[in-house]
């Protein structure tokens, strides 16, 4: 344990996702050893993101404006919406360069253990977007875990009666992954999406 501000910084950093006590300590000492200008830039950036970052009023993606760059781009395919859990998932999909439609960010996934139900997500707003019949397909790109699967199942049952095609991203075993480390959802999806190989395939 360290005294005063240094320990307070370590404690604050360790509360961030993916950063343990040792990682927090390394970052804290880096900040301590850095020039004051660099530390001030970091502090300013943290302050700015909390004060100025917004969420798109249409799709709820993080945006610096009321409407995000994807929703206001007329070149995007208006007939398709890709539904994701978080804004970081939008970036992941964009990196594939396989999708040119619109997005809808739910703000999480259905998770009873975390006290998060459908009413806590941007599901009502998604249904409102589908009401004008411009959208013909919804791609459910929630994470391939139990919460993501539960959310996708809930949404598919909700959207299907609206006459919109609902599809789910294919998922399976990662390349280089070991079978024994695969969870039951991933392994089950791998079996469902199996390909025939060999003679006559």
From Swiss-Prot:
Record's keyword terms, sorted: DNA damage, DNA recombination, DNA repair, Metal-binding, Zinc, Zinc-finger
Segments forming domain Toprim: 79-174
Top-level taxonomic group: Bacteria
Entry coiled-coil feature ranges: none
Family: Belongs to the RecR family.
Entry keyword DNA damage: yes
Purpose of the protein: May play a role in DNA repair. It seems to be involved in an RecBC-independent recombinational process of DNA repair. It may act with RecF and RecO.
Zinc finger residue extent: C4-type: 56-71
HAMAP family given in the database record: RecR (MF_00017)
Protein known as: Recombination protein RecR
GO-annotated biological processes: DNA recombination; DNA repair
MF-aspect GO terms: DNA binding; zinc ion binding
Transmembrane feature ranges: none
